[in-house]
């Protein structure tokens, strides 16, 4: 079973659709149906027609028995609002939740692909390199970018300690827009 967090959101729902196109339906889909500032009707529309084995609210995941049976993690879930100012909310959703998933990937020896953000680069004054020594030089311009940067830095700390899943990938998304985001157009 493949875990997809943020499965009702823009990127997560398109990922699940692509997995479905590949014939993969044994998916544990996780999201916040009533996430702060999001219209539930939009997520319901994004989920329409998708095939998955089980849906869980984000806070239910860690106590569900299926969590111990997953074979891969696509972590696309987060508070993605660049205008969010609630630092505790961002820490809980974008850093701490991600750390638990990362540790689970290591424990189960499964791959993890997670959504980072170009917001981690800040103004771009330091460039856009993902060389490990450069990442610590970046200064995000908003709390959202800072939360994503903090998780990236934590991952690098785990790498230095040799405490990572065998395969893990952080994807830096740049100002994404497309199908399932029409409400923002």
Regions found by a protein language model. Name each.
Residues 1, 25-27, 111, 167:
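Residues at the starts of beta-strands that form the adenosine-phosphate
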Residues 2-24:
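N-terminal Rossmann NAD(P)H-binding glycine-rich loop of SDR-like oxidoreductase domains
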Residues 5, 30, 73-77, 112-118, ...:
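SDR active-site strand-loop-helix element
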Residues 29-59:
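Glycine-rich phosphate-binding loop and adjoining beta1-alpha1-beta2 segment
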Residues 49, 58-93:
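NAD(P)H-binding glycine-rich loop region in Rossmannoid oxidoreductase-like domains
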Residues 79-81, 118-126, 174-177:
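Active-site segment of SDR-like NAD(P)-dependent oxidoreductases
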Residues 92, 96-100, 107, 120-170, ...:
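Catalytic helix-loop patch of NAD(P)-dependent Rossmann-fold dehydrogenases
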């Amino acid at each position: 079973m493949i875990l997809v967090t943020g499965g009702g959101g823009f990127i997560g729902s398109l990922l699940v659709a692509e997995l479905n196109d590949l014939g993969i339906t044994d998916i544990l889909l996780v999201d916040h149906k009533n996430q702060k500032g999001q219209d539930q009707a939009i997520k319901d529309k994004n989920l329409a027609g998708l095939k998955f084995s089980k849906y869980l609210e984000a806070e239910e995941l860690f106590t569900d028995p299926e969590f111990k049976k997953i074979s891969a993690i696509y972590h696309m879930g987060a508070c993605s609002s660049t205008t969010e100012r609630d630092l505790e909310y961002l820490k809980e959703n974008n850093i701490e939740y991600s750390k638990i998933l990362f540790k689970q990937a290591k424990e189960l020896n499964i791959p993890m692909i997670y959504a980072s953000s170009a917001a981690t680069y800040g103004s771009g004054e330091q460039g856009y390199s993902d060389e490990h020594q450069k990442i610590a030089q970046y200064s995000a311009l908003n709390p959202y970018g800072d939360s994503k940067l903090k998780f990236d830095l934590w991952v690098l700390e785990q790498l230095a300690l040799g405490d990572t899943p065998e395969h893990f990938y952080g994807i830096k998304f740049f100002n994404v827009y497309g199908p399932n985001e029409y409400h923002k157009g």
